[in-house]
Every structure is written in C-alpha cells, then in structure tokens.
From Swiss-Prot:
Keywords: Glycosyltransferase, Transferase. Optimum pH is 9.0. PROSITE patterns: UDPGT. This is UDP-glycosyltransferase 13. One of its GO terms (molecular function) is xylosyltransferase activity. Its EC number is 2.4.1.-. InterPro entries: UDP-glycosyltransf_plant, UDP_glucos_trans, UDP_glycos_trans_CS. Optimum temperature is 45 degrees Celsius.
Amino acid sequence: MSASDALNSCPHVALLLSSGMGHLTPCLRFAATLVQHHCRVTIITNYPTVSVAESRAISLLLSDFPQITEKQFHLLPFDPSTANTTDPFFLRWEAIRRSAHLLNPLLSSISPPLSALVIDSSLVSSFVPVAANLDLPSYVLFTSSTRMCSLEETFPAFVASKTNFDSIQLDDVIEIPGFSPVPVSSVPPVFLNLNHLFTTMLIQNGQSFRKANGILINTFEALEGGILPGINDKRAADGLPPYCSVGPLLPCKFEKTECSAPVKWLDDQPEGSVVYVSFGSRFALSSEQIKELGDGLIRSGCRFLWVVKCKKVDQEDEESLDELLGRDVLEKIKKYGFVIKNWVNQQEILDHRAVGGFVTHGGWNSSMEAVWHGVPMLVWPQFGDQKINAEVIERSGLGMWVKRWGWGTQQLVKGEEIGERIKDLMGNNPLRVRAKTLREEARKAIEVGGSSEKTLKELIENWKKTSRKT
C-alpha cells in the first residue's frame, strides 16, 4: 500500500469541544491519542473561550500536533439573562446547544468526509441528532467515571419515577445498572434543582446517551474491578451503546508548564515523604478553610507541596500568601513545606519520587493522573461529580475520603482533623501497595493487547468501515 493509500484509509474523526478545563483536557488528550493511532483529526472549537487556560491549551495542542485541523464553530448571539444561572461554563454550554443547527453545514463541508463525530458529554442531546441527520456515527466522550456516567443515564428515569421530587431525602438512594446504589447525599446538589439550567441539560443529555453509537470513558477495566464486560453484555441485550474504556488518556507535551522551583524543592526531599495538595482550577476554598488547611498541614508533621488557590477558574489571585495565611502561619509552613500560588506541572509533581500522597478535590482528570503515577489519594470533594469519584477511588483501594467533608454536612473542617487524616494517608502502606499495582495495570491497559488499546483499535476499525462507505 502506498503512503497516499494508507492516508486515504485512515478514519477521519471530528471532536466537538465544550468548555471548562475538566471537559476540554480529556478531549484534547483523546485528539492526541487518535493522531498517535494514525487517524485524521479535526477539532471543532468556539471562541472566545471562557478562560485563558482553554485557549492556551487549544493553541498548544495545535502547535504540537500540526496534523490536527481546527474548524471554528461560530455561535449565535446568546443573552445570558435568559438563563437562570451565572455560571460562565453552563452559559457557554447552552450557547453551543442553541447553535446546534449551524453545525450541519460545517460538518458537511469537512474534507475528506468524516467517519465519526465525538461529542463532549455536556452537549449530547443537541448534537447526536445533527450527526444522525448526516448518517454519521456519533460517540459521547464522557469526562468522569463510569459510575458517574451510569448515574447520568439513569437520572432522567429516577426523576420521572418521583411524583413528588421535592420529598427526596439525603439518605435515599438511586439504583444504577451494574453498580451499587448512589446515595442522594453524594449527588451534586444542583441535580436536585429541576428548575436549574444545568439540570435541564443533564436530563436531556442523559436521555440522549442511548442514541449514540458508543460512550467513550477515560478509564480502564482494572480500575473498574473487571465489571465492564458484564455491564456491556447487559447493555447490548437492552439495545444500549457500549461503555468503551479508552483510558488512561495521558497528559501531553502541550500541557507542560515552566515552574521549576517546586521540582527543585522536591529534589531535596526523601522518597515518598511529601504530600501534594491541590484542588484544581474550578473551585477555590474559602479563606477560612485555607487557614485551617495550613494548620492541618503543619499539625500532620509531613512535608508538603501546596498549591494555594483562592479564585476560581484561571483568574489571578490578588491576595498574597501573607494575607491569606498570616505571616506567623506562613513562617511555620516554610519550615515544613513549599507553598505556591502559581499552577504547577501536576504530572511532573505526581511522578516525582518524593511525592507519597495527594490531597485532591477528586476531579476525574486529577484522579486518573494519580492512578497513572501510582500516588494514593485523600479525596476532599468540593462540588460536581467529586463525591461519586471519591467512592470509586475508595472502592478501588487507591485512596480514602471522609464522608462528612464537603457539601451538605460539615462546613468548616478544622486543622486538627485535617492533620490526622493526612498522617493516616501518608502512613497507609496498603494504599501505597495498591497504588503501585494500579499504576502497572494502567500501563498494561494502553499497551498492545491491553483492554483500552483493544477497545480503541476496534473503534478505529469500525470507523474505517464508515470511511469506505463515504
């Protein structure tokens, strides 16, 4: 086969991007993965992005992978006052959804013709019909755990089954196929507000998952306890699309940031002695909780690397560390650890020999990065899917979480308790052993013949068949 014939036989896959780094990061990683598996890739973007971090990530991806094509999706004007939320990401999702009919001509104009459309999970209900209208296979890229995916699919039926939804109690449970029931106390509070824009989108998306050709999830079979094949057999019998484990989706070169000071500090620390503390880009702890966390880190007696964030998204923090923590506390902290307000290269930190534990919000991307590097976690959920993810991490044996930490219960966690939990994490040898085991399983999953590698190959072969029909 000539080089041109080989290129022509490659499937051409478009990825419809959403907004928010928690959604964008796995989409861009999946785009890079497809290129590495010899697929043509087009990403469909919309500007201006909500945050600078998003536009930067897209630009760096395109710079590192010049073979990826970008198509800009121009959105209709959208008046945010017509939506009952001020969240900039929810508003962007709605703006994209309302412009769905404009995507048809854009997809039709792409050359060579597309083999498949991969849609971010926040946009499914509006764009699966667009793909179907073009006789184009569509796939959901789900950006959280399989357990969370099953909950989102099941939630519309759960809502429909309740004659009085307002009577739901926190100790009620939601039955989800293939998994243990989800306590309502672990469900994001916004799910329980049926008048909220997010919940409207959630229910519509959950109903539309079944209309896609497959649901791609950043996970691997060993992390799921080997239950995915059985779940997919049942889904096939019920006429539902399969859960396709395509993870772990690895961090790419374009994600690296220049921040050498923390790494230099880590180089001087003993192996496995440092707890890394970071709560992601989407949520900021209150100033009171930041002070208690600082006190807890000191009380733990452990070395630590702490990324302090007091503003949401990628806004610059105006308060200095002195103002946030107080000069006396900051001086004590400097004796034990390294504190930084800038973002760090999380992959480089987690991969460092000195890091032996991770205090995290439980975002799925961060959780999968910890799995990849074999770092046990203390999960402190803050919002969204993070309590569900904490359950997954705990059941996998990779981490621990305190159920009364987070929304709906204890509002301010005191430093004394934080310190004790960090000591528990850093002294837990079974967690370390399990983390190393899952680290090896994660690598096996994407090697030739691994569970995720085989799944991806099967997808690509199916897309090649679509290419030959066009």
